[in-house]
């Protein structure tokens, strides 16, 4: 009987040892899987953070490029307007001896129009640059259309200034010294003013 009891006790101990061993294996496998899942999650988080940083850098670079282009466009418009204004002054000085005070008055009007046009171009370019900066900060990628709009506005303004100056000087040069020429020149100045107003 004692032998039978010893045998049962031995089997119970053996079963307990097997159970503990299996439980240890299951626990070890669970720990390994948990560690592996943690590593994967950490790697995915790092990858996502890297992508976010890349996107932020790209947006920042695009915003900087847009700002530089807007600045270049503004400078080009300023240079063009300055050149047009200088040409008007040179032409006025050359023609003043032939046409007297009438041409001087018209030249002053042309200078004022050129200055107004330059101011409007500068203001429009500044507004466009501010809009570009705000859009970039908000993460919007509208740089291309904004730059195209700025370029068209500046071109339109510069062409308006040139047309106003050329119209004023051209009419004065063709019709210098006659009352009829003075009337035509006044009409041309009014038309140029209307064109410039529409461009604004």
Swiss-Prot record:
Induction: Induced by abscisic acid (ABA). Residues 52-81 form a coiled coil. Transmembrane segments: none annotated. GO terms for cellular component: nucleus. Residues 115-130, 186-200 have a biased composition (Low complexity). Residues 13-23, 30-42, 53-81, 88-97, 105-114 have a biased composition (Basic and acidic residues). The keyword Coiled coil applies. It comes from the Eukaryota. Keywords: Coiled coil, Stress response. Residues 1-145, 172-200 are annotated as: Disordered. Belongs to the LEA type 4 family. PANTHER family: DAUER UP-REGULATED-RELATED (PTHR47372), RE19971P (PTHR47372:SF11). Involved in response to stress. This is Late embryogenesis abundant protein 19. It comes from Oryza sativa subsp. japonica (Rice). The lineage of its organism: Eukaryota, Viridiplantae, Streptophyta, Embryophyta, Tracheophyta.
């Amino acid at each position: 009987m004692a032998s039978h009891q010893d045998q049962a006790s031995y089997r119970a101990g053996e079963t307990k040892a097997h159970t503990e061993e299996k439980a240890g294996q299951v626990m070890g496998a669970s720990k390994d899987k948990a560690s592996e899942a943690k590593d994967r999650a950490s790697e995915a988080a790092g990858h996502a953070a890297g992508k976010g940083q890349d996107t932020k850098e790209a947006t920042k670079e695009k915003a900087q490029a847009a700002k530089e282009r807007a600045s270049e466009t503004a400078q080009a418009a300023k240079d063009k307007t300055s050149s047009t204004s200088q040409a008007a002054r040179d032409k006025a000085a050359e023609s003043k001896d032939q046409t007297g005070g009438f041409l001087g008055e018209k030249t002053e009007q042309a200078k004022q129009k050129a200055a107004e046009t330059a101011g409007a171009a500068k203001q429009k370019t500044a507004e466009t640059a501010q809009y570009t900066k705000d859009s970039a900060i908000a993460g919007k990628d509208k740089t291309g259309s904004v730059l195209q709009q700025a370029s068209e506005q500046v071109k339109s303004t510069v062409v308006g200034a040139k047309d106003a100056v050329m119209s004023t000087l051209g009419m004065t040069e063709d019709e210098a010294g006659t009352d009829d020429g003075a009337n035509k020149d006044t009409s041309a100045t009014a038309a140029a003013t209307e064109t410039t107003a529409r461009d604004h």
